[in-house]
């Protein structure tokens, strides 16, 4: 709780702000940029930066608990999606049996199907952080350092326009041959600024720069990708670097602000 103690009998006012110990629920939005990546067997064209156009949109829901000494512990749940909505790269070269020049698809009766292909990823990461106080009159704000890590999953989503003929090669289980489904673990280091208002429950935010290392592997028994030379089990391991920036709106559960008045 933030307390304000006012002594006003002789016209003097004294303000005192306390450090908070509270639960915080947060919502964030940001951008992710994949960096260089590697494949353990030397295959090229399969890392995140190669597969999908950038940047990605990153939306997250976060719960955290803040101690009075500035330490935080919490859990982040993220979803990433392609910013442009149709960002699978080189689809004709990757999936020559499905797409042909013009990036249209062969559907039933030889007609053209309309398919949107984009990436989607989910992540769940517990983490710990520390607020380093910078503002003398606000001990709950300052430089934020955070380390988190956990599980993530990414795949290609094929969305078909149902006003056009359907492409059976990308329907149901057949789509799994091309979707690059991968599971893995990731580690994220974050640095930024966190602000918690002395006056409002709603004027609380943080802006952070995130640096992530991702290790993943294919979760499908069979994958087809002509650029990677895949027509079978992908037995390799992937390593990707990710860079991001995000803005977070925080809602601390602190109760009502109290005012104490003394008359003498």
Regions found by a protein language model. Name each.
Residues 18-27, 69-75, 122, 139-145, ...:
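Outer-envelope beta-barrel architecture signal
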Residues 36-52, 82-121, 154-184, 218-226, ...:
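Extracellular/periplasm-exposed beta-strand and loop segments of Gram-negative cell-envelope proteins
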Residues 9-68, 72, 248-252, 264:
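Short glycine/proline- and aromatic-enriched beta-strand/turn motifs that initiate or cap beta-hairpins
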Residues 58-60, 121, 125-127, 188-190, ...:
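Membrane-embedded beta-strand positions in outer-membrane beta-barrel channels/transporters
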Residues 25-33, 63, 75-81, 145-153, ...:
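Transmembrane beta-barrel strands of outer-membrane/channel proteins
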Residues 189-264:
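Predominantly the C-terminal beta-signal and adjacent terminal strand-loop region
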Residues 66-70, 80, 133-135, 196-202, ...:
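Outer-membrane beta-barrel channels and translocator barrels
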Residues 1-9:
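Hydrophobic h-region of N-terminal signal peptides that target proteins for export
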